[in-house]
Amino acid sequence: MGWKILPVCLSLLLPVVLIQQVSSQDLSSCAGRCGEGYSRDATCNCDYNCQHYMECCPDFKRVCSPELSCKGRCFESFARGRECDCDSQCKQYGKCCADYDSFCEEVHNSTSPSSKTAPTPAGASDTIKSTTKRSPKSPTTRTIKVVESEELTEEHSDSENQESSSSSSSSSSTIRKIKSSKNSANRELQKNPNVKDNKKNTPKKKPNPEPPAVDEAGSGLDNGEFKLTPPPPDPPTTPHSKVATSPKTTAAKPVTPKPSLAPNSETSKEASLASNKETTVETKETTATNKQSSASKKKTTSVKETRSAEKTSDKDVEPTSTTPKNSAPTTTKKPVTTTKESKFLPLPQEPEPTTAKEPPPTTKKPEPTTRKEPEPTTPKEPEPTTPKEPEPTTPKEPEPTTPKEPPPTTKKPEPTTPKEPGPTTPKEPEPTTTKEPEPTTTKEPESTTRKEPEPTTPKEPEPTTPKEPEPTTLKEPEPTTPKEPEPTTPKEPEPTTPKEPEPTTPKEPEPTTPKEPEPTTPKEPEPTTPKEPEPTTPKEPEPTTPKKPEPTTPKEPVPTTPKEPEPTTPKEPEPTTPKEPEPTTRKEPEPTTPKEPEPTTPKEPEPTTPKKPEPTTTSPKTTTLKATTLAPKVTAPAEEIQNKPEETTPASEDSDDSKTTLKPQKPTKAPKPTKKPTKAPKKPTSTKKPKTPKTRKPKTTPSPLKTTSATPELNTTPLEVMLPTTTIPKQTPNPETAEVNPDHEDADGGEGEKPLIPGPPVLFPTAIPGTDLLAGRLNQGININPMLSDETNLCNGKPVDGLTTLRNGTLVAFRGHYFWMLNPFRPPSPPRRITEVWGIPSPIDTVFTRCNCEGKTFFFKDSQYWRFTNDVVDPGYPKQIVKGFGGLTGKIVAALSIAKYKDRPESVYFFKRGGNIQQYTYKQEPMKKCTGRRPAINYSVYGEAAQVRRRRFERAVGPFQTHTFRIHYSVPMRVSYQDKGFLHNEVKVSTMWRGFPNVVTSAITLPNIRKPDGYDYYAFSKDQYYNIDVPTRTARAITTRSGQTLSKIWYNCP
């Protein structure tokens, strides 16, 4: 019986299976469907144009395209290893299949025109098309691209976002592929209409960048977000290039992302709308889209090529949910948006997905729809206005982004502005999230600020990136301050002309930034640039205008890379002079100081500006601009005089020197001057000059503002200023020197802080420059200002509030309202105001640098903390200590950072008032090898003698070691399980560490390659210092040779 039943069962089952197969075939297979017409109901299509629209069934290639024929292969992208090809460029290489003419020639030619429609696309279109084809082929590539763009963008933003966006984009790319193919089919069907539409669109496109922009923007909507995606598509085609540019830009500048945003913004807006709308509208859109689809198609054709490619990519991505289209899009979109937002920079990237997503829903159609819509919307328009749009092709957009912001001010009118507007608009939409985040990040502000300025300059792109990040923080605060005015003025004065116009728009925004920008570039960049420009030497010119640009640009560019951007040149122009030169000097010293100075430098530029004026004053000097500074320096007396006058009359000088004022700053002021630079911009605002002085002063206070953001810049400046001062003398050759410095600076800026080290020496000379304060040397400075002498004399035996090494190796001491750069071979640099350079309210409670690859520096003041990368404040700070360190409260008097070593996690010990200590263990991350670790620095405390003494002492204390060891081993063990930061209970220092003094005034972690964990740990108590053995939790007092004081050993005091 069993055997008989079996066949019956089988016979019953077979039909079911077959039916399923057939139905599945109908749904997702091309078996028996090759060449059938396009159907919107089908999950995937098998007509011979489905590849163009990326809507082919997975087995289309296997089932419907024979190897040696072009049947069904016209929209394939080129792939190696085939006997013959059918892509649009095969004729060029003589590898077309025999039946290419009958199947594909017409298709490719007709497409071209549409592509052509879009100017850029012309060539691109083919390419794009082919690319598109290719792209589709490798959604992966697309995805990657997307990721890349994201990465670029993200560089600034968090990698996490990046990941999410990439993943979304990649997954979407798959779906996208399918979906897009479907859409493609539609398009293809509608192709003819498309052509018309294309024309229409094209006109749009052509007619105005706007339209294109719009297109893009429109697209932006969908596309906008798309845009992001587009970049990926871009890759395929010209757009890619463009986009590439964009992305690059993006990469270069987060701003770009913004642009993306911009488009996005529209897009975003639209996207947002779209998303909502999408859902709702989606349906409509779908229909509408359909139409648009055709239009879109055309567009697609044209745009398509452009965008299409992008789109396709986008699409690909978006298609993610092939079907989900709607929902997916909606949802996706949203998420994307979110991402976008989060990413803020990534935005672009994300947007991409976002967009992509969105479009998908509509699927291509919506896109068109959107595209269209947005276009109309225009948000872009303004953008488009700018040429950007045209470029929009996509790439452009990003670019605009940058511009966007600055222009924003102007933007509106001016496309340049687009940026801002972009942001503005985009912002809104995008901001929706993205934007906002961005701003949140600061970036935005930064961008805003920075951006603006930057754009002003053209920097745009460059700034874009840098700008954003850096500016972020700085920017904002700074702007807070007078920034605004500054831009107005500062720039103005100097650039008066240039600036103004520039400012016209940017400036304003810039103002916000202006200063900042400069700082933003902050320091680094600025100097960097300056330097270079400086070399330019234009010194003189510099004052004239450069300055302006400089700030504008420098900042931006610099920020981007600072260094690089700088080169970009914006700076250059800037340097063009003046500034630069000064910076040069400054710069150099800065390097010396290096890092800090560097930042300083960056700052410097600003100061430079101030300086500039000074030079102005010095004018002749100007030539020596640096000299100016130099001059001051050179003529120490002169400078001093200047100083004084400056101080005295800062106003007058100010006017001229507004920046000069800087000078006054010199002594104490020096920092101020620095500030001034920063402020300077401010100043300009006011009266520019006159105000400057005044402002400047306030600046000090403002400084804090700045501080937050600007400060760093300020810092930089001051440092720079000082440095430059000194340097200047050295620099005498200003221009040349400048150039040299520039290199250094670049290096420094780049972080080549290493150069910094060498720099420090320069710095010291700077000290002389500090001349402002210390005309010839510290002591002198002191003499100059007897009232300040004690407070500004690091060697008076008073304990410092904080001592730390920046990531670039610079050793910095903070006490009261001043800080000093320390060098193993020279006396301390002249004092500079903490507020002016770092932008943090002084005096600080403590400072420490993490012992990890990033080497971020943290400043604690009351209930807030700031995080710096070398001397540039990170965006989004200050933050609350209680939130950033697991609930840490109380008055922190010192902090000791401990490196991760074997099973010991990275942590930081906070010493509190009253002899208590609290340990915070960082969240444990996988071990990674640091690339380009800190420069090896030979601090005087590393001398053999000191080590020997420590060893002897160690033997003496031997007995306690085991004991302590046991006491404390449990704590470290406890810590290692953390997967997030963990704050341990507060305990008495004596219960945790052996040999520690009751009062710890400061602590420092010094890099030392001779130690197993790479560091030496020291604690200071009044006039005594202790070497800390972390594993045994023992502190050993260091006995110094007779006549050697802590100041002599640590600060190299005379």
UniProtKB/Swiss-Prot annotation:
Name of this protein: Proteoglycan 4
Placement of Sequence repeats on the sequence: 317-324, 325-332, 333-340, 349-356, 357-364, 365-371, 372-379, 380-387, 388-395, 396-403, 404-411, 412-418, 419-426, 427-434, 435-442, 443-450, 451-458, 459-466, 467-474, 475-482, 483-490, 491-498, 499-506, 507-514, 515-522, 523-530, 531-538, 539-546, 547-554, 555-562, 563-570, 571-578, 579-586, 587-594, 595-602, 603-610, 611-618
Biased composition (Basic and acidic residues): 188-200, 302-318, 364-399, 427-550, 563-614
Swiss-Prot/TrEMBL GO biological process terms: hematopoietic stem cell proliferation; immune response; negative regulation of interleukin-6 production; regulation of cell population proliferation
Hemopexin repeat windows: 797-840, 841-888
Segments of this protein annotated with the region 37 X 8 AA repeats of K-X-P-X-P-T-T-X: 317-618
The gene coding this protein: Prg4
Knockout or disruption consequences: Mice are viable and fertile. In the newborn period, their joints appear normal. The aged mice exhibit abnormal protein deposits on the cartilage surface and disappearance of underlying superficial zone chondrocytes. In addition to cartilage surface changes and subsequent cartilage deterioration, intimal cells in the synovium surrounding the joint space become hyperplastic, which further contribute to joint failure.
Originating species: Mus musculus (Mouse)
Post-translational modification: N-glycosylated. O-glycosylated; contains glycosaminoglycan chondroitin sulfate and keratan sulfate. O-glycosylated with sialylated oligosaccharides which are predominantly represented by the monosialylated core type I structure, NeuNAcalpha2-3Galbeta1-3GalNAc, with smaller amounts of disialylated O-glycans.
UniProt GO molecular function: polysaccharide binding; scavenger receptor activity
Secretion signal, residue range per the UniProt entry: 1-24
Composition-biased stretches (Pro residues): 229-238, 400-426, 551-562
Disulphide bridges: 30-34, 30-46, 34-64, 44-46, 44-57, 50-56, 57-64, 70-74, 70-86, 74-104, 84-86, 84-97, 90-96, 97-104, 795-1053
Tissue expression from the record: Highly expressed in cartilage, bone and liver and weakly expressed in heart, brain and muscle. Expressed in the surface chondrocytes and in synovial intimal cells. Isoform B is expressed in bone, small intestine, muscle, testis, heart, liver and lung. Isoform C and isoform D are widely expressed.
One family name in Pfam for this protein: Hemopexin
Biased composition (Basic residues): 672-699
Biased composition (Low complexity): 110-125, 162-175, 286-295, 329-339, 615-624, 700-712
Other known facts: Different forms varying in molecular weight have been observed. Such forms are possibly due to different levels of glycosylation and protein cleavage.
